[in-house]
């Protein structure tokens, strides 16, 4: 029974690592081009500081 448990844990770990490689990279830093496009899509009066975007831009 313990062997089955270890196999399940190993299989889950392998699947987790393989799907992480195929992720869209959402945990990576945005490129300068992405930041510029994001700034262009903001309504007037929005601040570029991520700390105040939610407050002033609703997003």
Curated annotation (Swiss-Prot):
Q: Which residues are reported to carry the modification Glycine amide?
A: 58
Q: What does UniProt say about this protein's domains?
A: The cysteine framework is I (CC-C-C). Alpha4/4 pattern.
Please identify the protein, giving its name as recorded: Conotoxin Bu1.2
Q: Which InterPro entries match?
A: Conotoxin_a-typ
Q: What tissues is it present in?
A: Expressed by the venom duct.
Report biased composition (Acidic residues) as residue ranges. 19-31
Name the predominant localization. secreted
- Gene Ontology CC, one term: extracellular region
Q: Which family does it belong to?
A: Belongs to the conotoxin A superfamily.
Ranges in coiled-coil conformation: none
How far does the signal peptide extend, from start to end residue? Answer: 1-16
Q: Name one GO molecular function term.
A: toxin activity
Q: Which residues form the propeptide?
A: 17-42
Its subcellular locations are: Secreted
UniProtKB keywords = Amidation, Disulfide bond, Neurotoxin, Postsynaptic neurotoxin, Secreted, Signal, Toxin
Q: Which cysteines are joined by disulfide bonds?
A: 46-52, 47-57
